[in-house]
Design a protein with these regions (language model features):
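Secretory targeting signals
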Residues: 1-18, 30
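N-terminal and secondary-structure boundary signal
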Residues: 2, 6, 24-27, 33, ...
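Residues within the helices of the helix-turn-helix
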Residues: 21
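Ser/Thr-rich, Proline-interspersed low-complexity disordered segments
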Residues: 40-113
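Intrinsically disordered, low-complexity regions of eukaryotic proteins
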Residues: 8-11, 24, 53
């Protein structure tokens, strides 16, 4: 297990940089794929995702700390006052650099020819290691395996949800892993299957509040077992600086995001989220999990804020308009290839103990899919909510429906009639959650 942190944590091993041979091989493959896509009438809109990134101008010898101070903060537009449209925003001002190799095109888009997106469900009562592994294996098998997602030698990143920091505790004596953060046994099970599929390198990533989140919440032990590298996305390690990654087609709030370069250099990106309600977004699953991709320091209204307050804006009203759009923009900039949602033991009424209505619930369920929008839609329905609900209605009581925005952006489908559920039905696993309305 390797540790890559914003802090001065010792580093056992750094991920390899692309060799010239690998660069040429991947560039050639990308060019061939583009040529093929141009010849195919039904090419997915996601083929344009992960556009060229531009590095900041910090010297290559800079440390993570100096890189952070030299990287210009991102700019965002004012909150739109009408439904989302493809309006222009302020162009990025980062210094241009040679084009980076694009990541693999997501396989999570609705299939052509009327085929429905598939989402797998598994009923499971606890986090017993063998049972979790068997459940995840069964779901992956029902989705056709990982062969169309992970290819031999691929570099794969798993984004976990470790929100809030270790000072926060679970309700009623439950651990955070059994309430508001991704359970490590779910990460372990998927990681083992990814390695079985031939992955050449595995990374577990999150913009953690502190490194202790990895240690105390089980990911450090899982990374050691898997031979994976842990990376704190708040910093630049193991690279000299951040990259600016464009939002394909532009965004309504942000035109680009500042990322740790690992998010661009990987071949496959997976989201392992917790099944929860959310104060601003209504629900938080695979798509919302990507809020934790960006370094918090660049997305604060004031330096004193510990969270990404610039995403929210000054009020709940602005947050309800901004955050759903930003969720979609992040998913366009860094698409998800495979989504897994931990709903075995979780919380209702809010995303964490800082929400007054937060409390425990044990649905005993897992969800998986290659269409992250569909996967989130099924999880939302299993919470007793309508994934197509209009803005300002339950569960999206404070703003826009980010599932609808994601579907409109071509990231997947949120309509249950367009989704084929594998395993138990939604009604079989449905457990009505208290929404975050207090």
């Amino acid at each position: 297990m390797n540790k890559i942190s914003e802090s001065s944590e010792p580093q056992v091993q750094r991920p390899r940089r692309l060799s010239r041979r690998d660069f040429l091989r991947l560039a050639g493959a990308a060019a061939a794929g583009l040529a093929l896509a141009r010849c195919t009438p039904s090419a997915s809109p996601a083929a344009q995702l992960m556009e060229t990134a531009t590095a900041t101008s910090v010297p290559s010898t800079a440390t993570a700390t100096t890189a952070a101070s030299a990287t210009p903060p991102p700019t965002s537009t004012a909150v739109p006052t009408s439904p989302p449209t493809a309006t222009g925003v302020v162009p990025a001002t980062a210094t241009p650099s040679p084009a980076a190799v694009a990541t693999a095109v997501p396989t999570a888009q609705p299939q052509a020819g009327g085929a429905r997106s598939k989402v797998a469900i598994a009923s499971i009562r606890d986090y017993d290691r063998a049972r979790v592994r068997a459940a995840v294996q069964e779901m992956v098998d029902s989705l056709g395996g990982l062969g169309d997602v992970v290819r031999p030698g691929d570099r794969v990143a798993i984004k976990v949800n470790l929100t809030g920091g270790v000072g926060n505790k679970g309700p009623d004596g439950l651990s955070p892993m059994e309430s508001f953060v991704t359970h490590p046994e779910v990460v372990r099970a998927l990681g083992e299957l990814v390695l079985d599929a031939g992955a050449g390198a595995l990374f577990i990533v999150e913009a953690v509040y502190q490194w202790a989140s990895y240690t105390e919440w089980g990911c450090e032990e899982v990374a050691r077992h898997l031979g994976a590298t842990l990376i704190d996305l708040n910093g630049t390690d193991p690279y000299p600086d951040y990259v600016h990654v464009a939002v394909p087609g532009g965004g309504e709030i942000y035109n680009e995001f500042i990322f740790n370069p690992i998010l661009q250099e990987i071949d496959v990106f997976m989201s392992v989220a917790k099944m929860k309600c959310h104060w601003v977004a209504g629900v938080t699953h695979s798509l919302k999990n990507l809020i934790g991709l960006v370094p918090a320091r660049f997305y604060r209204l004031t330096p004193e804020h510990s969270h990404r307050s610039a995403f929210h804006g000054p009020t709940d009203e602005t947050a309800g308009q901004r955050v759903p759009r930003i969720i979609v923009e992040l998913n366009k900039a860094r698409p998800i290839h495979f989504a897994l949602i931990d709903g075995i033991k979780t919380t209702e009424g809010g995303e964490g103990p800082w929400i007054r209505t937060f409390g425990p619930i044990a649905p005993g369920v897992l969800f998986a899919g290659k269409d992250p929008v569909a996967t989130d839609a099924v999880a939302t329905a299993a919470q007793g909510f309508d994934p197509t609900a209009p803005p300002m209605t339950v569960p999206f009581v404070r703003g826009l429906n980010h599932l609808a925005l994601a579907a409109a952006a071509g990231l997947g489908t949120h309509r249950l009639e367009e989704i084929e559920v594998m395993g138990p039905s939604i009604e079989d696993v449905r457990r009505d959650f208290r929404p975050c309305v207090g």
